[in-house]
Structures are given as structure tokens and as C-alpha cells.
């Protein structure tokens, strides 16, 4: 493979990693926030507990997007095949 081909493949791989890798967390976070808002609307006195649990869950969901970003950065800037 030529260096140009490897560079193009790295750019496309990074774009797919960030593009597709952010869809899951975005949908998951949207559903989690919607469910938390619905639960708080039903039981306002439990808002503190629900908010705390929501933030922990959102942090766990967001790790997938962060991992995809790290993979994309590795493909772009630390790719061992680019020479």
C-alpha cells in the first residue's frame, strides 16, 4: 500500500469511528434523560436521587463516544502504518 492510500484509509476510518460511534451514545443519552425527566415528573421528591443516578449513567454512556474519539485521534496522529 502506498502512504497516500494508508492516509486516506486512516482519515476515512477516523470519520467513521467518530460518526458512527457517536450515534449510540447520543441515542442512549436522549433516552436516559427522557426517562429521568418522566420519573421526576411522576415523583418530584426523588429528583435528587434520580439526578445523581442519571449523571453516573450519562458518564458511563459517554465513555463509548470518548473511546471512539481516542481511536480516531490514534488513526490520524499516531498511526504506525503511515511511516
From Swiss-Prot:
F-type ATPases have 2 components, F(1) - the catalytic core - and F(0) - the membrane proton channel. F(1) has five subunits: alpha(3), beta(3), gamma(1), delta(1), epsilon(1). F(0) has four main subunits: a(1), b(1), b'(1) and c(10-14). The alpha and beta chains form an alternating ring which encloses part of the gamma chain. F(1) is attached to F(0) by a central stalk formed by the gamma and epsilon chains, while a peripheral stalk is formed by the delta, b and b' chains. The keyword Ion transport applies. PROSITE patterns: ATPASE_C (PS00605). Pfam families: ATP-synt_C. F(1)F(0) ATP synthase produces ATP from ADP in the presence of a proton or sodium gradient. F-type ATPases consist of two structural domains, F(1) containing the extramembraneous catalytic core and F(0) containing the membrane proton channel, linked together by a central stalk and a peripheral stalk. During catalysis, ATP synthesis in the catalytic domain of F(1) is coupled via a rotary mechanism of the central stalk subunits to proton translocation. Key component of the F(0) channel; it plays a direct role in translocation across the membrane. A homomeric c-ring of between 10-14 subunits forms the central stalk rotor element with the F(1) delta and epsilon subunits. This is ATP synthase subunit c 2. The chain crosses the membrane at residues 8-28, 58-78. Keywords: ATP synthesis, Cell inner membrane, Cell membrane, CF(0), Hydrogen ion transport, Ion transport, Lipid-binding, Membrane, Plasmid, Transmembrane, Transmembrane helix, Transport. Its main location: membrane. Belongs to the ATPase C chain family. One of its GO terms (cellular component) is proton-transporting ATP synthase complex. It comes from Cereibacter sphaeroides (strain ATCC 17029 / ATH 2.4.9) (Rhodobacter sphaeroides). NCBIfam families: ATP_synt_c, PRK13468.1. CDD domains: ATP-synt_Fo_c. One of its GO terms (molecular function) is lipid binding. It is found in: Cell inner membrane. It is a multi-pass membrane protein.
